[in-house]
Structures are given as structure tokens and as C-alpha cells.
């Protein structure tokens, strides 16, 4: 299967399936000398792991990571970094009835068509959201590369099931500690009621996640086919539940006039050649596909989980109509577990762009 590797200077390859022995990845291109331990990776994996929070699946996975190579005495060596995360609580018997039928909203039908009728029906196999654990592990390394330049990445949920957090009340710094990774504390009680209602109805919920990257240096990204916003969109759209991404004002910019959407440049506090500041950030930190030095701001649309506790119509392998009720243990929403995944993919894209810029000898 092609398409398992992301990046050019910093490359992450992931492997594994939802109900196989485990999953993992290899990071190639990481500089030597970064402090890295299993505990560093585990802290981020614990944010994503199943079995915690009001919307999470009841599947219990420790998601304990093992570093297999590329690290010596707590530091990266510059060689490929391999890691592995065992699957410990898979229940494949829950999926026996899905060997012959295709689940609506899942990748079952598309995989069946692409791979000549061969697919792992147990929990979706390679298409399962469980694959994203390896992305989170790789993202830890990318975040460490960025931290050397003072770059930080924050994520938080700004909308769940159509109920949006007030833009004026966002507190991204505290999002990770709140239920749903909520970017505003005022909306949590409304989301609690919505989740209870959806659970009673056997339904699932989608939402919108906001990602911010702070202290990103100006000059990252390439001017044509590898624009930084295009690479970031590629990164986050590769996550299975993601259906859309906005940079800065995004689709709202279509309703603005140029005078409203432009970000005026102002002299820096201490004016000098090559320095300026902006009066606003409608562009989301990217101009002409290249970082401007402002915060990069993304809004990511996350679809409802396709596994619902409601009988659905579908067809079997012979094309005959059947009704299915999906068993197993499933999230009520990809939120909040998807937040560290989106942070990781943003970090991988930015770290890759940073290393490419350095490789080209263009400063930074």
C-alpha cells in the first residue's frame, strides 16, 4: 500500500492495523542531539489513548510506546527512530458480521474496490483511527525540533455537534485540561447535554478543531506546488475523520472585501530593514504559501464517527441488500482524541518545512 509516508526532510512512515499485533512508525531525518525518551512520547499518547472522557470508546489500550532505535542515552543519534505500540484490548469477534457487509460511512467499500476484494474487516484494519497513535508519537519528535526555534502548537475544540464556543472567550492555553479539549470553558455544560442526548439516541457527533502555531519564523514553505498552507492541508486532511480545513479566515474570506481581508503592515516597534508587524491576521500566518512570521491558525472540520448504534441499510459482497447494526466499542465523537493528532500533523509539516529551509541554506 503506497501513501504511508509523510514529509521530505523529516519523514514519518507508519504501519499496523487496529486488530493486529500493534502499530508503529519510523522517523527519518531527525537531527542528532534532541532529548527524547519513551516518557516524552507517552505523555502525548496518553492524551489520545482510548477509554477516557465522555465521548471515548470503552476499548482500553495502555498505548505503551517502545523506542526501538535512533536514541542512545536519552538523545537522538541522527539515525532512523523506530517505535512500536502494542494492541492489547482488541475484540475481533465484535466484527464477525462485517466480513461480508460494508459499513456506511466507513472505508470498507472503497478498500474492497481498491484492493481487489481484500480487506481487514476487524475494526477497519489500516483505515481505523487507531493508526493515528503512530502519528502522535512521530509528532512528539517534530515538536521537539520546532521547540528549538521556540515554536509551540496548541489545539482545542471550538465546535461540537453544531454548538460553537464564543470566539471572544477562547482560551487555547487551557484547552488540553478541559473536557472535550474545549477552547472555551463556557461551552462545556452545553456539550455535556448534547453528548448525553446523542448517546441516548445511538448517534455520534462531529465538530471543529482550532490549531494555532506560535512563533513560526517567516520564510517557511515553497512558492508554488508546495505552499505551506497546501502542505498543512495535506497533513491534516490525511487524518481519516477530517473533511475540511481553513487557514486564517478561510471560507469566511469569500464574503469579505479586499480592504477587510488584507492585513496591513506596520513598522516594527524598533524599525529596521526586514522587520515589520501586522495590524491583523486574516491570512492565518501564511502569504503566498510562505509563513509571514505571524501565528498560523487552522480550523479543521471533523465528521461524526461513522459507527452508530442504529440499524442501517447496506449491501453485502454479493451486492444483496442487508440491514446491519454495528457492534464493538466506538467513540461517540473523534473529539477530543483527534486534537493531539492534528497537533502532531501540524508539527510534522512545520518541522519538515523548517528542515527543508535549513537544507537549502536559506537561514533559520
From Swiss-Prot:
Q: Which residues hold NADP(+)?
A: 48
Entry-linked PANTHER family: CHORISMATE SYNTHASE (PTHR21085:SF0)
- Coiled-coil stretches noted in the UniProt entry, renumbered to this chain: none
Q: Which domain of life is it from?
A: Bacteria
Instruction: Output the Pfam families linked to this UniProt entry.
Output: Chorismate_synt
Name the enzyme group at the top EC level: lyase
What interactions and quaternary structure are annotated?
Answer: Homotetramer.
Q: Does the keyword NADP apply?
A: yes
Q: State what protein this is by name.
A: Chorismate synthase
- Gene3D superfamilies per the UniProt record, alphabetical: Chorismate synthase AroC
Looking up InterPro entries in the UniProt record yields: Chorismate_synth, Chorismate_synth_AroC_sf, Chorismate_synthase_CS
Amino acid at each position: 500500500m503506497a501513501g504511508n509516508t509523510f514529509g521530505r526532510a523529516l519523514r514519518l512512515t507508519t504501519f499496523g492495523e487496529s486488530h493486529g499485533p500493534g502499530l508503529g512508525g519510523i522517523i527519518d531525518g531527525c537531527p542528532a542531539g534532541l532529548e527524547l525518551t519513551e516518557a516524552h512520547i507517552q505523555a502525548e499518547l496518553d492524551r489520545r489513548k482510548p477509554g477516557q472522557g465522555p465521548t471515548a470508546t470503552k476499548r482500553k489500550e495502555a498505548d505503551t510506546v517502545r523506542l526501538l532505535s535512533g536514541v542512545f542515552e536519552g538523545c537522538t543519534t541522527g539515525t532512523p527512530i523506530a517505535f512500536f505500540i502494542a494492541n492489547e484490548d482488541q475484540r475481533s469477534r465484535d466484527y464477525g458480521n462485517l466480513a461480508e457487509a460494508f459499513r456506511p460511512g466507513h472505508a470498507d467499500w472503497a478498500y474492497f474496490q481498491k484492493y481487489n476484494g481484500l480487506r481487514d474487516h476487524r475494526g477497519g484494519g489500516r483505515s481505523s483511527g487507531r493508526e493515528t497513535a503512530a502519528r502522535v508519537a512521530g509528532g512528539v519528535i517534530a515538536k521537539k525540533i520546532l521547540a528549538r526555534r521556540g515554536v509551540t502548537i496548541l489545539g482545542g475544540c471550538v465546535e461540537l455537534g453544531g454548538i460553537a464556543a464564543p470566539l471572544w472567550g477562547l482560551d487555547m492555553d487551557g484547552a488540553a485540561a478541559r473536557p472535550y479539549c474545549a477552547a472555551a470553558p463556557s461551552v462545556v455544560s452545553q456539550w455535556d447535554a448534547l453528548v448525553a442526548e446523542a448517546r441516548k439516541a445511538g448517534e455520534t457527533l462531529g465538530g471543529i478543531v482550532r490549531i494555532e502555531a506560535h512563533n513560526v519564523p517567516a520564510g517557511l514553505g515553497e512558492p508554488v506546488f508546495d505552499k505551506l498552507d497546501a502542505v498543512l492541508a495535506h497533513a491534516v486532511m490525511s487524518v481519516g475523520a477530517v473533511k475540511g480545513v481553513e487557514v486564517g479566515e478561510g471560507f469566511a474570506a469569500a464574503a469579505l472585501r479586499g480592504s477587510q481581508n488584507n492585513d496591513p503592515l506596520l513598522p516594527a516597534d524598533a524599525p529596521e530593514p526586514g522587520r515589520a508587524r501586522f495590524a491583523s491576521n486574516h491570512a492565518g500566518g501564511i502569504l503566498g504559501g510562505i509563513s509571514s512570521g505571524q501565528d498560523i491558525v487552522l480550523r479543521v472540520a471533523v465528521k461524526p464517527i461513522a459507527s452508530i448504534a442504529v440499524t442501517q441499510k447496506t449491501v453485502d459482497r454479493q451486492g444483496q441488500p442487508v440491514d446491519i447494526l454495528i457492534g464493538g466499542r466506538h467513540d461517540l465523537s473523534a473529539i477530543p482524541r483527534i486534537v493531539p493528532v492534528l497537533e502532531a500533523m501540524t508539527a510534522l509539516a512545520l518541522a519538515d518545512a523548517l528542515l527543508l529551509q535549513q537544507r537549502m541554506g536559506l537561514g533559520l
